[in-house]
Amino acid sequence: MNLKNPETPDRNLAMELVRVTEAAALASGRWVGRGMKNEGDGAAVDAMRQLINSVTMKGVVVIGEGEKDEAPMLYNGEEVGTGFGPEVDIAVDPVDGTTLMAEGRPNAISILAAAERGTMYDPSSVFYMKKIAVGPEAAGKIDIEAPVAHNINAVAKSKGINPSDVTVVVLDRPRHIELIADIRRAGAKVRLISDGDVAGAVAAAQDSNSVDIMMGTGGTPEGIITACAMKCMGGEIQGILAPMNDFERQKAHDAGLVLDQVLHTNDLVSSDNCYFVATGVTNGDMLRGVSYRANGATTRSLVMRAKSGTIRHIESVHQLSKLQEYSVVDYTTAT
């Protein structure tokens, strides 16, 4: 390889990456509704780690399962892939919505995002971010520092609807009580979700969904993954880091981060050559979940590439005998 001109991600990478999220969804799918989120998440991590190392790339996990001493696999800074091919930053969430998965509730998904090496934002252990995300019609029209009503009116105008027809998806958390009140005072509707704000943001950017905006404070890693999706869909995300304690504030200071800076889509992912891949674990607004039958299973995935603007919906039929290769989980029974 010419180190001065390393390979850049190409269209083939997207189809390799979807195999990774399919494996994670299949591994965690057997744990849906069983009330065991750690076991289900662990199965997804195992499967994702196994499959991601078969992908032709020189990947580095930028957004993973935690620091090296906290996560045995898919930790921040871990090198993944075959060691050949394009050099990429990787962001993973083997199960976005572990509680949703454990309780058998909608919108649990397995996610992987990728971009050219060195182009993903590193939040330096600041785990939360105030966020707003919208679809293509309202991109460039929102301002995270403006009042809630301003953004609702801007989205309504850009979509040609009344503010009363705008639906805002918000994580159901005590910290959002005032935000929810502001949304309703502006005349808009609120859709509360218990987990999974990546799925909420993607739903807001899809024409076929009845969600128009995602607002609120959620995970910074999810914000970066969402930025990859917005790049692919033509939407927009804005964020402001929201450290929860002095330790996070110090980590941000040590890393040279500006806490009151508005982070735009391009700040979170600076490359236009990026990918977003997701496979449904449970049925949801964005994707249907894994469905099992006697001799195998079916998965539904969303595969997007920003450079080409291509969005693919993929339904895959998997043979039961092959599923056993993905994880230690027994796919024949829910043990």
From Swiss-Prot:
Binding residue positions for Mn(2+) 1: 41, 65
What keywords is this UniProt entry annotated with? Carbohydrate metabolism, Cytoplasm, Hydrolase, Magnesium, Manganese, Metal-binding
The reaction(s) annotated as catalysed by this protein in its Swiss-Prot or TrEMBL entry are: beta-D-fructose 1,6-bisphosphate + H2O = beta-D-fructose 6-phosphate + phosphate
Q: What happens when the gene is disrupted?
A: Strains lacking this gene are unable to grow on the carbon sources acetate, citrate, glutamate, and lactate and display no detectable fructose-1,6-bisphosphatase activity.
What upregulates it?
A: The FBPase protein levels during growth on glucose, gluconate, ribose, pyruvate, lacatate, or citrate do not vary much (inferior or equal to two-fold) with respect to the carbon source.
| Its EC number(s) | 3.1.3.11
Cofactor binding note from Swiss-Prot or TrEMBL: Manganese. Mn(2+) can be replaced by Mg(2+).
* Localization (cell): Cytoplasm
Describe regulators of its activity: Inhibited by the monovalent cation Li(+) with an inhibition constant of 140 uM. Also inhibited by AMP and phosphoenolpyruvate and to a lesser extent by phosphate, fructose 6-phosphate, fructose 2,6-bisphosphate, and UDP. ATP and ADP have no significant effects on FBPase activity.
| Pfam family of the protein (one) | FBPase_glpX
Q: What does this protein do?
A: Catalyzes the hydrolysis of fructose 1,6-bisphosphate to fructose 6-phosphate. Is essential for growth on gluconeogenic carbon sources. Also displays a low activity toward glucose 6-phosphate, and fructose 6-phosphate, glycerol 3-phosphate, ribulose 1,5-bisphosphate and myo-inositol-monophosphate are not significant substrates.
Membership in a protein family: Belongs to the FBPase class 2 family.
Q: How does it assemble?
A: Homotetramer.
Protein name, UniProt field: Fructose-1,6-bisphosphatase class 2
Which species is this record about?
Corynebacterium glutamicum (strain ATCC 13032 / DSM 20300 / JCM 1318 / BCRC 11384 / CCUG 27702 / LMG 3730 / NBRC 12168 / NCIMB 10025 / NRRL B-2784 / 534)
Tell me the lineage of the source organism: Bacteria, Bacillati, Actinomycetota, Actinomycetes, Mycobacteriales
